[in-house]
Amino acid sequence: MGRGVECALASSKDMELVGVFTRRDPASLKTLTGAKVFSMEDAEKMTQDIDVMILCGGSANDLPKQTVDMAKLYNVVDSFDTHAKIPQHFAAVDTSAKENGKIAVISAGWDPGMFSLNRLYGQAVLPNGHDYTFWGKGVSQGHSDAIRRIEGVQDARQYTIPVEAALESVRRGEDPELTTRQKHIRECFVVAKEGADRNVIKEAIVTMPNYFADYDTTVHFISQEELDRDHAGIPHGGIVFRTGTTGLNNEHRHLIEYKLTLDSNPEFTSSVLVAFARAAYRMNKEGMSGCKTVFDIAPAYLHPESGDVLRATLL
């Protein structure tokens, strides 16, 4: 995702990449644009040079500590995506940011992030209705990693795919009650190590709790060459629906559909982070501090143009 942020900043004329901070040896990291590379230990020495720090670490082990620590020094943006733990992450980051007069935007990305906003708008506009969120078709990196941890597996990719019948039922306004299995299927492409028992691997995948057991799961065994050739990208996407009714007798039906089709999941997420970095800087310049989510940030803060231009051209 760091590479994605580097690319997104190159397309943002009002922003400048001061440097990339790494826990590795800075000399070992080659950037795409020739940006300077610093050790993470240097971060606290550069507070006068940097307006916003964009955090590209993982939600499981990096961001719970990193966002809190960095918000003591900088305005920050992260893409924390463990939905169930967002309230506790918010509370910890809010304390740190407020105590140090900084803005910290958490959980920016597309889900949480852009999808969250569309769920909120849908519920606000159509209070009598139902939400539906579908993910894919796309590579789930967490599920792919789970397969790779199975004994006998050399490499793997897992795709999350919406069930077409479920999508069409929602679009027809049938307001279906959908189980996990009825919403998505999982398709796995697996490279088995030489001599590994494929039946044992397949059984371990399809019965894996929290990952595959609740889904209809298909497993394909292919060669490493085929995997590298046909499944090297990280596409993703999804759809947020809000169905609802209006009128005294709920006689009129409505459907809101917001869809993403992404060639590169990390690059799109990075582009969202950069837009919210702009907002964090602007809000802090106005004297605001504390933790913010996409729900708390006015859209005009995200766009490089002024309010006058936005009102004249987009409104």
In which residue ranges do the predicted regions lie?
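C-terminal substrate-binding/catalytic lobe of Rossmann-fold NAD(P)-dependent oxidoreductases
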Residues: 3-4, 11-43, 139-277
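Short alpha-helices
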Residues: 98-123, 273
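General beta-strand structural signal in soluble alpha/beta enzymes
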Residues: 78-79, 104-108, 134, 157-158
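Oxidoreductase and adenylate-handling cofactor-binding alpha/beta cores
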Residues: 114-130, 145-155, 279
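Rossmann-fold NAD(P) dinucleotide-binding segment
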Residues: 43-52, 60-79
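NAD(P)-dependent Rossmann-like dehydrogenase/reductase catalytic/cofactor-binding core
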Residues: 250, 254-315
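Rossmann-fold NAD(P)-binding glycine/threonine-rich loop
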Residues: 80-106
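Gly/Ser/Thr-rich loops at beta-strand to alpha-helix junctions
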Residues: 1, 60, 83-86, 107-116, ...
